[in-house]
Amino acid sequence: MTLLRSVLLAIVAASSLPAAANSCYVTAETSGAVPPPVVTEKCFEYQGMDDDAIDWVCQDNEAVKNSRREIRDSCPSGHFGICTAAITPETLANERATGSQATDTPGPTTVPREARILTYHYESTDRAQARIDCESAGGEWSQ
């Protein structure tokens, strides 16, 4: 009876832990008058990876001015486009290093072959450029 009670208590305790974050919301704005400032607002998430894999790349870094990263449970609705690309070891450190941009450097094989990064775009000074950047890096654009 005591063993059963301990097992049930362990299950309840584990299920009451906060869920691991699995998305990262990023806002950024360049400064300066020429060229005009570039504003971006996006959220990315990993598929086929552990839920906590995004925690390191989503750390808000004070050294990067005019940029803010926030860990969230999920990306919100309201995007104008989604870029889907393969995750590489480099993507785990820099979410923009995806697909063909990250295939030249051999890395550890700890990333599952089917792992993907989905980047939801909400705000961009040049929406067409967001699609061009996605596709030229080996990603697939959808709306």
Sequence positions of predicted segments:
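Bacterial N-terminal signal peptides that target proteins for export
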Residues: 1-8
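N-terminal signal peptide c-region/cleavage motif recognized by signal peptidases
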Residues: 16-18
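Mitochondrial intermembrane space
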Residues: 20-143
